[in-house]
A protein has these predicted regions:
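Non-catalytic terminal/accessory segments
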Residues: 1-370
Length: 370
């Protein structure tokens, strides 16, 4: 049966892709079909995906725009594919990711197997102790502004399967159904919220930034998590030069450096007393700045360390307020812990990894709300 199809795609690959999508959960897309509704005719739905992808006739539906609030008060727009489309995207991702990921830089940490945000924070912490200056920058609307021609050039360099190339191009062109039900065509970018989008973002940034800076500034190590980047420098002059060079490089790649989220930082501590106006930066929910610490002999000194950011604390407190714990007094502590312990545990496991005493503020706030 498979031999009569245009493309040789195994049914087992589609099944494995579905299991990954199921594990990731997620909301319904434009067709309003939830994962549970999709599973009511699981065999038929998976066969339909396999049949259409194998014949070359699979056409991705529009992605559903969902706006979520950002910690800085802005709005982040996600593009949520349908469950069927998430399975189809996962099929391609599972096929191409192993070979592509092997090419990525060791200091690319976002959305990669075996990599994590905490690894990026820890590596940045260690480098801040060794190097005095940091260039921190963010890319304005990175997912929404990736140039399709440049991206597909990178994709074709790594992906040779014709059907994978065909569907990647179709996903890039899939329109967006906005919150007011307007269908907007897509001419650039890859929707943040798509299954394959993080891999495409990493591939684009691999050539736009990682390879470039490794060649032009090999003595300036970096940590990148998607479009959030920190680069370490030996001097203020080097940092100033590099910030300008990065801005130019991004423009060449048709991206824009975020004007208010890009800066030069001095990693001040007891051994680095230089007067410089900017002595802190926030990376992946942690604010790096001078903090009191004890050395091996128990003596107090100032070190440059990460701790949970005020923005992250504010976001967590806001979430706790929505639980309305004070009006749920009839609930037993066991019931409350069953409901909220998984969330709290995740927060403390992440933000408590570095300078954990800062998380006492959240623990105290939670106690007041009970």
């Amino acid at each position: 049966m498979a031999s009569t199809k245009s493309f040789d795609i195994s049914k087992q690959l589609v099944w494995n892709a579905y299991k990954r999508v199921k594990a990731n959960k997620g909301a319904a897309g434009v067709d309003r079909v939830s994962l549970s509704a999709f599973e009511q005719n699981l065999k038929g739905n998976l066969y339909k995906i396999w049949n259409r992808m194998s014949s070359g006739s699979y056409m991705p539906p529009a992605v559903q725009q969902v706006n979520i609030p950002k910690k800085d008060g802005g709005i982040r727009s996600l593009g949520v594919p349908t469950v069927s489309d998430r399975v189809a995207q996962m099929v391609v991702k599972m096929l191409i990711e192993p070979d592509i990921d092997r090419c990525f830089h060791t200091d690319s940490y976002g959305y990669r197997p075996g990599k994590s945000a905490l690894q990026a924070v820890d590596k940045t912490r260690q480098r801040c102790w060794r190097m005095d200056w940091v260039v921190e920058f963010d890319i304005k609307g990175a997912f929404d502004n990736i140039d399709h021609a440049l991206l597909m050039k990178a994709v074709r360099h790594h992906v040779k399967e014709p059907w994978a190339l065909l569907y990647i191009e179709r996903w890039l062109k899939a329109p967006t159904l906005t919150v007011d039900s307007t269908l907007v065509p897509r001419t650039q970018g890859t929707p943040q919220g798509g299954v394959i989008s993080p891999l495409l973002m990493n591939l684009f940034m691999h050539y736009a930034f990682d390879v470039w800076i490794s060649k032009t500034s090999p003595k300036c190590p970096f940590a990148r998590y998607a479009d959030d980047v920190v680069v370490h420098c030996h001097s203020e002059a080097q940092a100033n030069y590099l910030l300008r060079a990065i801005e130019v490089r991004l423009k060449v790649c048709k991206l824009t450096m975020h004007p208010t989220k890009s800066k030069i930082v001095y990693c001040k501590d007891s051994n680095r007393p230089l007067a410089y106006p900017i002595k802190a930066f926030t990376f992946l929910g942690f604010t790096f700045r001078p903090r009191k610490a004890n050395n091996k002999e128990g003596k107090l000194f100032t070190s440059f360390l990460p701790a949970v950011s005020n923005e992250a604390l504010k976001s967590m407190r806001s979430r706790i307020r929505t639980w309305r714990l004070s009006v749920r007094t009839p609930s037993t502590l066991v019931e409350l812990s069953r409901l909220y312990n998984p969330i709290l545990r995740g927060w403390f496991q992440y933000y408590g990894c570095f300078y954990p005493t800062q998380m006492r503020k959240l623990a105290d706030y939670l106690e007041l709300r009970l």
